[in-house]
Amino acid sequence: MSSCVSSQPTSDRVAPQDELGSGGGSREGQKPCEALRGLSSLSIHLGMESFIVVTECEPGRGVDLNLARDQPPEADGQELPLEASDPESRSPLSGRKMSLQEPSQGGPASSSNSLDMNGRCICPSLSYSPASSPQSSPRMPRRPTVESHHVSITGLQDCVQLNQYTLKDEIGKGSYGVVKLAYNENDNTYYAMKVLSKKKLIRQAGFPRRPPPRGARPAPGGCIQPRGPIEQVYQEIAILKKLDHPNVVKLVEVLDDPNEDHLYMVFELVNQGPVMEVPTLKPLSEDQARFYFQDLIKGIEYLHYQKIIHRDIKPSNLLVGEDGHIKIADFGVSNEFKGSDALLSNTVGTPAFMAPESLSETRKIFSGKALDVWAMGVTLYCFVFGQCPFMDERIMCLHSKIKSQALEFPDQPDIAEDLKDLITRMLDKNPESRIVVPEIKLHPWVTRHGAEPLPSEDENCTLVEVTEEEVENSVKHIPSLATVILVKTMIRKRSFGNPFEGSRREERSLSAPGNLLTKKPTREWEPLSEPKEARQRRQPPGPRAGPCGGGGSALVKGGPCVESWGAPAPGSPPRMPPLQPEEVMEPE
């Protein structure tokens, strides 16, 4: 059985091959891609088939946007897959094994970036959307999340265009795939795009999970867990749409085409990655741990105020922004609740960060807020010691240690007694006596004995609600690529008819049963089932229509049927092309 936690430090890893970013080059002052350039030579490429976890970026890997802009373009006509086709180009798995649900990540750090005291790469300054600004306030009204239900994917010469977004480098890799750097041409801003394959989610839904207890029913005021992976994704979107806090990652846009397999979630770019890797030989100092933990407290207090339980708090889900503050990410297993607390009975999340009451054999109902407090305690322990408090190579032994083993502190590094007291109270195995968030905010270690008080709940939290009308008004309808090509062709041919209609009908007629020996029509638009006399009655008096069936007229210079119609007599009204008969559907 795969191990849950490894006590060995993460080994050096080989950088994965750039799969898409090499096609993102552009000249200075130009956008990465010229939209709809050369539509006649467009090709559509779609190779995404991954469930992306935004927070699973390579820790310490900065996104060098200058390199992303200056990479050489691909050759014309070369396919641009979103995942490397060569298995040897993928990075090997590292020694870190956080859980059965979380594989190791790989990726290089840019050598041109500077390093902070933790060795984490710091990227150059870049433009951000107002939502990602450090000055954003949770008390400001949030702009409704844009939902696009029509997705146009264009394979151009040097990039892959997804609506207004140009997909570039791979900036992270999670349990189900990759995260792509996305450039928005409308606001000249970089974002992180999370891609989900609905088919793959359904295939992977068979991963072994603990069955619900017999006769279990959701408690009043509690949560009802979604039944399938697709429902979990849409629950994550519903939760993220209503959140607006400096310490919570923001969902900017959702691109969803009901007729296609993929769903795209566009997030603000948190460019410095997770706060730390676990396990590590370089834990944080107490001052650094306090700084990040204060951000975590404010973010969790805000989530609980919005009646949301995160259920997967851990260092890899805490991303460091350009301003140095952390943002909570990955709401894939979150729960919304009614009342004062969530009443839960199922087991989800990362095993090493699960609370003992969630691992009980009796499957009793337990508090959702207490689960987040336990995970916060494990995270704080990781901050200062670089490892989890309970570790084992076997999942069942790990569960046993979490439920019964006493908490121990290593001799090194030596930490303050106040910090030991806080961790001990957060990792209380009894959820009823476990410390709660309001008490954590006032703890002497958190506030430096009152020198650094945290804001009150009223200052930190504002209830955010998005009405259905606001969501409907935020939906953006974008024509598909086929529609754009059709309009382009109609304009080029100066025709108001569908230039592809004839070929489609001919193919359908030849494929219909009983029509294999039917004589080919003399005009491309002629339906096989309409008699010749009916066609003649439908035509207006005048010269006989040419072979293109009235696709143009002499009034349009260069039209496809100029030779068939000729010029009208002087002084006579202009002739109109014959009416095109209505399409008759052939049996299939």
From Swiss-Prot:
Q: Native species of this protein?
A: Mus musculus
Give me the Gene Ontology terms describing cellular component: cytosol; neuron projection; nucleus
Q: What are the start and end residues of every segment in region (RP domain)?
A: 204-226
Kindly name one Pfam family recorded for this protein. Answer: Pkinase
Region Calmodulin-binding, as annotated, extends over: 475-500
In-chain residues carrying the UniProt-annotated modification N-acetylserine: 2
The name this protein carries in UniProt is Calcium/calmodulin-dependent protein kinase kinase 2
Domain of life where this protein originates: Eukaryota
